[in-house]
C-alpha cells in the first residue's frame, strides 16, 4: 500500500472499529477526542508546513489519525502517548496501514510532562491534537525542553487558542499568551469544526501556529525569573502592577522601584505588557537583604 493512498488514513468507520477492538472509549479525564476525518488531518499537516526532512513529535496520538498523515509528509514521527492501551496499539496500526513507513515511526509510552529526551534525531516540529485539559502546560514544556523544535501547530480548545495568540491589551491576554510568546511568534491558524471528532466535543477547536524566535529575547533575566513576574502580575490581574508585584518584590514600594527602573508605569496592569517588558521588570528585581 502506498502511503499516499487515501485508505492509508483512518476514516470514521476505521476509528470506531479500532476503538471497539481495543475496548477504548475516549475519556473526559484525559481530554480525549479522536479525529475521524482524513481531510482534517491532512489539512493540519499542510498548515503545519511539515517538510520531508522534518522529525515531528506528536503528543497524544490516540488511535493514530494524525500520526499516519504526519508519516506521509515527514521524515520521522515520534509519538508520545500516556494511555497504556493506545500506546500498545499504535505501532501495530502504523505497521498495518503504512508498512513502508513503519521504520520511520517511534513511540514513547509516557506522560509528555515527564519526557526529557526523545529517540532519534532532535525534533524539528511539534504537531498535535493536544488533550484539552493539559494543552498549555504540555505545549510550554515541550518548547522549553526541546529547543530544536522550530515550528509548532497544535489543535486546542478555541478559547485556549485565543489566549495563546492574544496580544497585549486583549481581554484574554494572560499567562499562556506571554509564556508562549517567550518562545515563539504565535498566531491563530484556523478553526476546526466539532463534527470531525469522536465523540463530538461541546466546544469548538482552533489551530495555533508557533514559530520559534530566531533570536531569544534580549535579557539578562532567566526564563524562570521572567515567568515569576508574569505569574505574579496575572495572579491579581485587576490590580496595578505596583500592587500585584508587591509579593514578588517584597513590598509595594519595592515593586514600584523595580517598575520605574524598567521604564514601566507602576499604575499599569499586566495585560498591557509585552513579554519584553516583563523581562525588563525581572532584570530589576530588588535584592532582598538578609538581616
Swiss-Prot record:
It is found in: Cytoplasm. It comes from the Bacteria. InterPro entries: KsgA/Erm (IPR001737), rRNA_Ade_diMease-like_C (IPR023165), rRNA_Ade_Mease_Trfase_CS (IPR020596), rRNA_Ade_methylase_Trfase_N (IPR020598), rRNA_adenine_dimethylase (IPR011530), SAM-dependent_MTases_sf (IPR029063). S-adenosyl-L-methionine binds at residues 33, 35, 60, 81, 111, 129. Its EC number is 2.1.1.182. Belongs to the class I-like SAM-binding methyltransferase superfamily. rRNA adenine N(6)-methyltransferase family. RsmA subfamily. This is Ribosomal RNA small subunit methyltransferase A. The gene is rsmA.
Amino acid at each position: 500500500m502506498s502511503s499516499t493512498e487515501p485508505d492509508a488514513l483512518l476514516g470514521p468507520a476505521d476509528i470506531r472499529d479500532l476503538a471497539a477492538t481495543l475496548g477504548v472509549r475516549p475519556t473526559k479525564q484525559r481530554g480525549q477526542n479522536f479525529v475521524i476525518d482524513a481531510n482534517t488531518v491532512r489539512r493540519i499537516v499542510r498548515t503545519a508546513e511539515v517538510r520531508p526532512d522534518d522529525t515531528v513529535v506528536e503528543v497524544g496520538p490516540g488511535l493514530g489519525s494524525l500520526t499516519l498523515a504526519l508519516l506521509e509528509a515527514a521524515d520521522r514521527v515520534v509519538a508520545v502517548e500516556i494511555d497504556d492501551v493506545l500506546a500498545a496499539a499504535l505501532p501495530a496500526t502504523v505497521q498495518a496501514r503504512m508498512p513502508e513507513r513503519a521504520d520511520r515511526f517511534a513511540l514513547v509510552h509516557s506522560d509528555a510532562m515527564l519526557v526529557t529526551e526523545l529517540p532519534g534525531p532532535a525534533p524539528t516540529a511539534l504537531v498535535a491534537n493536544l488533550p484539552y485539559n493539559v494543552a498549555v502546560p504540555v505545549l510550554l514544556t515541550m518548547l522549553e525542553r526541546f529547543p530544536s523544535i522550530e515550528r509548532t501547530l497544535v489543535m486546542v480548545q478555541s478559547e485556549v487558542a485565543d489566549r495563546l495568540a492574544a496580544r497585549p491589551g486583549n481581554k484574554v491576554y494572560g499567562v499562556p499568551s506571554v509564556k508562549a510568546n517567550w518562545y515563539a511568534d504565535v498566531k491563530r491558524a484556523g478553526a476546526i469544526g466539532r463534527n470531525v471528532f469522536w465523540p463530538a466535543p461541546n466546544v469548538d477547536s482552533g489551530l495555533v501556529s508557533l514559530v520559534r524566535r530566531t533570536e531569544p529575547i534580549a535579557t539578562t533575566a532567566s526564563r524562570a525569573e521572567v515567568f515569576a513576574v508574569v505569574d505574579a502580575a496575572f495572579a491579581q490581574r485587576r490590580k496595578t502592577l505596583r500592587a500585584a508585584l508587591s509579593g514578588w518584590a517584597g513590598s509595594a514600594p519595592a515593586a514600584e522601584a523595580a517598575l520605574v527602573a524598567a521604564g514601566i508605569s507602576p499604575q499599569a496592569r499586566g495585560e498591557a505588557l509585552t513579554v519584553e517588558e516583563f523581562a525588563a521588570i525581572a532584570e530589576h528585581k530588588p535584592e532582598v537583604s538578609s538581616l
